[in-house]
Design a protein with these regions (language model features):
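The feature captures the beta-strand-to-loop junction immediately N-terminal to the Walker
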Residues: 34-36
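Conserved ABC ATPase "signature" region
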Residues: 140-157
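ABC ATPase NBD Q-loop/coupling interface
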Residues: 58-84
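Conserved ABC ATPase signature
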Residues: 161-165
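Helix-to-loop junction immediately C-terminal to a conserved catalytic motif
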Residues: 49
Length: 237
């Protein structure tokens, strides 16, 4: 699979923030977007996921065949329905207002594009044991929400209200929600904001693990050293 920017011009209110971008990202790659504050990293991510409309150009998804070839007609992200797009691309934005939900309930919202109902404490066990409610089970019989909580190291927070957490803890919850969405393309805007050194390392290890599973991971970050060591491609804005 490929995720590509085709002569993409992005910006605010018709004012371009950069020259046309042409880039192609492959399954299993980590892509770092670097740039000073105000350079347009967040705007670019929002345009990639169609939260903002491009000034010109397209963001495309080319689905691969078993023989490694690509389909002739790619999907254009901005022409997809909201639900279809949410099955292909997820985005982690900087922590904002959080609803009065438990950690488990908020993370389970990532499953809505797949037709799964949000999980509360009363139905998590039921959903894990009933594939008819899930529509799918992951290997090891873990529900995608439970797996996301475990991967992000926050299973012990499942019953806590998100509003009681620190900014760094909320950031990890929102990352778990994006993981639970289980899209082949993940966009992350400064995913290590508010995190200490140990938690930052854990997040970057998780992103490497997800890329090894074949996902395309695109990260807007100020962590230049990490980008130079681990990213397969770097976009400098």
């Amino acid at each position: 699979m490929q995720f590509s920017l085709a002569s993409l011009v992005y910006g605010h209110r018709g004012r371009a923030l950069a020259q046309p971008l042409n880039a192609t990202f492959e399954s299993g790659q980590i892509v770092a977007i670097l740039g000073r504050n105000g350079s347009g990293k967040s705007t670019l991510l929002n345009t990639m996921v169609a939260l903002l409309k491009p000034i010109s150009g397209e963001v495309r998804i080319s689905r691969g065949h078993n023989d490694g070839s690509q389909e002739e007609r790619p999907l254009v992200v901005h022409k997809m329905s909201v639900q279809e797009r949410a099955r292909w691309v997820s985005i982690l934005l900087p922590t904002a207002e959080t609803p009065p939900l438990t950690v488990q309930e908020l993370v389970s919202l990532g499953r809505l594009p797949h037709g799964n109902r949000p999980l509360g404490a009363s139905n998590l066990g039921e959903s894990i044991s009933s594939s008819s409610n899930l529509g799918e089970k992951l290997s090891g019989s873990l529900h995608p929400v439970e797996q996301a909580l475990e991967l992000c190291g926050i299973s012990h927070w499942a019953a806590r209200k998100v509003q009681t957490l620190s900014s760094g803890q909320r950031q990890r919850v929102m990352l778990a929600r994006a993981v639970a969405q289980d899209t082949p393309i993940m966009l992350l805007d400064e995913p290590t904001n508010f995190l200490d050194v140990e938690a930052t390392d854990e997040v970057f290890q998780l992103l490497s693990h997800l890329a090894q599973q074949g996902k395309i991971i695109i990260v807007a970050t100020h962590q230049r050293d990490w980008a130079q060591r681990h990213a397969h491609q770097v976009l400098q804005l």
